[in-house]
């Protein structure tokens, strides 16, 4: 039974109309439920089938009727069935007991691991933190991943858009971030699967168990809670599951005073579900068929993701761009809320450079001298200009070869190739299939390392020494090993 139903007011209504996932319920005069209240319908239909579902009130229609959207399939639901107003919004379990578990939009566990060992629940609809409670000073969230920390740093309590096709390393990057926030920041993570494939959710769960992010033997040692409303679910579930995941994250931030990572995969599906619900409720569509409340819907979710004086929720959101059209209202509205973008490039993955984060396409509002400091800013811009020059020279190299370049350009190419290799690093969660121990690289080590490459101090070291290492000390050790092996 849904957690929301535990606070039942007992006001009973009758289902009068069912159109797909939308139902109209009639209540006694003066006892209408509030908008966003959860209604619970349980019982047997005339055919003897068990029916149990929760719906959320969306509209008050007049004539003592409300219109609600179901959070699960309405198969078997018939007119005349009894609906109970729970008196509150949908509520989900929160706290440490959620770690290592998989929930649906209603906070019910769906992983066959038994009931959740907590009585603490929280409603999924809440106000965003007050302005006076916010942490206003921008602070960089160190991930320990060189390419991100140097070129597109994340803001603590900020929102990051994650762009990338299939098979370029999104899942491994997500796992590494979850691992690093747990080990280095003492934080936890919440994963919200919004309208994506069930198979992907299952694969992710199995990979989390393999990499130790979820400890199957002792769930209390797990570092992530998962909340799924996948492609096969009704639009109501897909529209609200992001809020369910966010509510779990808010508890860790506000009550446990922790730094939290919230992953949303995929934020576009949240908008898409809102569009479907809007049409079902009979609202006039807006541009490209989206809901007229698009900006409000996205804003209500995004404004709750922030840093407070107590803790922070840093959100990483996979963004699907329909037909690669960045001007589509859904991605365009999302972009307005993002502080950074991390773009994964197939060309880098093909070269074996992991993480395959594109150093030229990825951006961050944090990369400015007033926030990260002059040295970090100068180093990042020098790295980008070196890589950009290398990109411009690639056509000439392909046609005429390296020998036709000027001395300066040859030096630039040599350093750019070392930079490109040095942007790769071994991940902790990938140890099981690379056989290499993972590396967490401190920001100061990252900056110092790239400065040494740019200054020419390391021009005499072989390019291969920079590949899949942590800091510059490891580069030098690897170079000595390569040199020793060559002499044998």
UniProtKB/Swiss-Prot annotation:
Pfam families in UniProt: ATP-synt_ab, ATP-synt_ab_N, ATP-synt_VA_C
Enzyme Commission number(s) of this protein: 7.1.2.2
Enzyme class: translocase
InterPro entries referenced in this protein's UniProt entry, alphabetically: AAA+_ATPase, ATP-synt_VA_C, ATP_synth_F1_bsu, ATPase_a/bsu_AS, ATPase_alpha/beta_chains, ATPase_F1/V1/A1_a/bsu_N, ATPase_F1/V1/A1_a/bsu_N_sf, ATPase_F1/V1/A1_a/bsu_nucl-bd
Binding positions (ATP): 164-171
Keywords attached to this entry: ATP synthesis, ATP-binding, CF(1), Hydrogen ion transport, Ion transport, Membrane, Nucleotide-binding, Thylakoid, Translocase, Transport
Entry's Gene Ontology molecular function annotations: ATP binding; ATP hydrolysis activity; proton-transporting ATP synthase activity, rotational mechanism
Entry's Gene Ontology cellular component terms: plasma membrane-derived thylakoid membrane; proton-transporting ATP synthase complex
Protein's cellular compartments: Cellular thylakoid membrane
Catalysed reactions, semicolon-separated: ATP + H2O + 4 H(+)(in) = ADP + phosphate + 5 H(+)(out)
Membrane disposition: Peripheral membrane protein
Residues annotated as transmembrane: none
Known function: Produces ATP from ADP in the presence of a proton gradient across the membrane. The catalytic sites are hosted primarily by the beta subunits.
PANTHER family xrefs: ATP SYNTHASE, ATP SYNTHASE SUBUNIT BETA, MITOCHONDRIAL
Subunit structure, as described in the record: F-type ATPases have 2 components, CF(1) - the catalytic core - and CF(0) - the membrane proton channel. CF(1) has five subunits: alpha(3), beta(3), gamma(1), delta(1), epsilon(1). CF(0) has four main subunits: a(1), b(1), b'(1) and c(9-12).
Protein family according to the UniProt entry: Belongs to the ATPase alpha/beta chains family.
HAMAP family the record matches: ATP_synth_beta_bact
Protein's recorded name: ATP synthase subunit beta
Organism name: Prochlorococcus marinus (strain SARG / CCMP1375 / SS120)
């Amino acid at each position: 039974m849904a957690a929301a139903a535990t606070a039942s007011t007992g006001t009973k209504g009758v289902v009068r109309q069912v159109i797909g996932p939308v139902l109209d319920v009639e209540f006694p005069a003066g006892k209408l439920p509030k908008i966003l209240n959860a209604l619970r319908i349980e019982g047997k239909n005339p055919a003897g089938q068990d029916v149990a579902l929760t719906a959320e009130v969306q509209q008050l229609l007049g004539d003592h009727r409300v219109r609600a959207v179901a959070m699960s399939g309405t198969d078997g639901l018939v007119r005349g069935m009894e609906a109970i107003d729970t008196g509150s919004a949908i509520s989900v379990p929160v706290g440490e007991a959620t770690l290592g578990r998989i929930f649906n939009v209603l906070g019910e566990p769906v992983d066959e691991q038994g009931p959740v060992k907590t009585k603490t629940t929280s409603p999924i609809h809440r106000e965003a933190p007050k302005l006076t409670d916010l942490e206003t000073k921008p602070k960089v969230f160190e991930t320990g991943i060189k390419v991100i920390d140097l070129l597109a740093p994340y803001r603590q309590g900020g929102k990051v858009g994650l762009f990338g096709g299939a098979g370029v390393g999104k899942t491994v990057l997500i796992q590494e971030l979850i691992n690093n926030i747990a080990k280095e920041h003492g934080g936890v993570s919440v994963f919200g699967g919004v309208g994506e494939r069930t198979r992907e959710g299952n694969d992710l769960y199995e990979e989390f168990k393999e990499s130790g992010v979820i400890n199957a033997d002792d769930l209390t040692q797990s570092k992530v809670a998962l909340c799924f409303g996948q492609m096969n679910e009704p639009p109501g579930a897909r529209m609200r599951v992001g809020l369910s995941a966010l509510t779990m994250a808010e508890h860790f931030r506000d009550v446990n005073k922790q730094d939290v990572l919230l992953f949303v995969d995929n934020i576009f599906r949240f908008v898409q579900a809102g569009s479907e619900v809007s049409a079902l409720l009979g609202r006039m569509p807006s541009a490209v068929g989206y809901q007229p409340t698009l900006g409000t819907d996205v804003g209500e979710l995004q404004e709750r993701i922030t840093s407070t004086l107590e803790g922070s929720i840093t959100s990483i959101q996979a963004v699907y761009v329909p037909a690669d059209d960045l001007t589509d209202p859904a991605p365009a509205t999302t972009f307005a809320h993002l502080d950074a973008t991390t773009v994964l490039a197939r060309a880098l993955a093909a070269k074996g450079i992991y993480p395959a984060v594109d150093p030229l396409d990825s951006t961050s509002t944090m990369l400015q001298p007033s926030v990260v400091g002059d040295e970090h800013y100068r180093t990042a811009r020098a790295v980008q200009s070196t890589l950009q020059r290398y990109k411009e020279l690639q056509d000439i190299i392909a046609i005429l070869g390296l020998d036709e370049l000027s001395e300066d350009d040859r030096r630039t190419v040599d350093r750019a190739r070392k930079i490109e290799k040095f942007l790769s690093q071994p991940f902790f969660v990938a140890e099981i299939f690379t056989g290499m121990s993972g590396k967490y690289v401190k920001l100061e080590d990252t900056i110092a390392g790239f400065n040494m490459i740019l200054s020419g101090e390391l021009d005499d070291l072989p390019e291969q020494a920079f590949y899949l290492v942590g800091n510059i000390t490891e580069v030098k050790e690897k170079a000595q090993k390569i040199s020793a092996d060559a002499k044998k």
